[in-house]
Design a protein with these regions (language model features):
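A short helix->loop->beta-strand "cap" motif at the edges of active sites that frequently abuts
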Residues: 12, 33, 91-95, 119-121
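Active-site phosphate-binding strand-loop segment of PLP-dependent enzymes
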Residues: 36, 40-111
Length: 141
């Protein structure tokens, strides 16, 4: 919710994966942003079809949510996949928000968008102690 409040204004647009975590859309609606769903499909290894997304008018899109390892599909993204998504964000001046709480428990070597220096200005990554340290329900800070 706080990311939406910090980066969005009424009428801005947000790219939200389908299937995906419902809170991405809910938090965006709080600030009266418009939700644009992009489909994840097994034919594309549950990755965003960037060419399809790019065929739309993206001038009002401010945030694109991604989540890898993905829930609910369990799909994983490679560093190369994440680099393509980050490049897409930079090209269109879209903040890529990578909800990444499962990386530390589902990957042999956790992958981070922040490893790709060229795109750091257009990415934000979230992690969670509840997944990696079995702290579900704990509140810190």
């Amino acid at each position: 919710m706080h990311i939406s409040m910090a980066f969005l204004n009424k009428g801005d647009q947000v790219l939200v994966p389908n299937p995906g975590y419902p809170t991405y859309a809910s938090a965006s609606k709080i600030v009266e942003a418009d939700i644009i769903c992009y489909d994840l499909s097994p034919e594309n290894n549950w990755l965003p079809n960037l060419a399809s997304i790019e065929s739309n008018n993206l001038s009002k899109v401010k945030i694109m949510w991604i989540n890898y390892p993905n829930m609910p599909t369990g799909a994983n993204a490679t560093v190369e996949d994440l680099e393509k998504i980050a490049a897409f964000g930079k090209k269109h001046n879209i903040l890529i928000c990578h909800d990444n709480p499962y990386s530390f428990i589902l990957n042999q070597k956790p992958i981070s968008l922040l490893e790709i220096n060229e795109y750091k200005s257009h990415v934000l990554e979230l992690n969670s102690l509840s997944k990696s340290h079995n702290m579900a329900g704990w509140r810190l800070g």
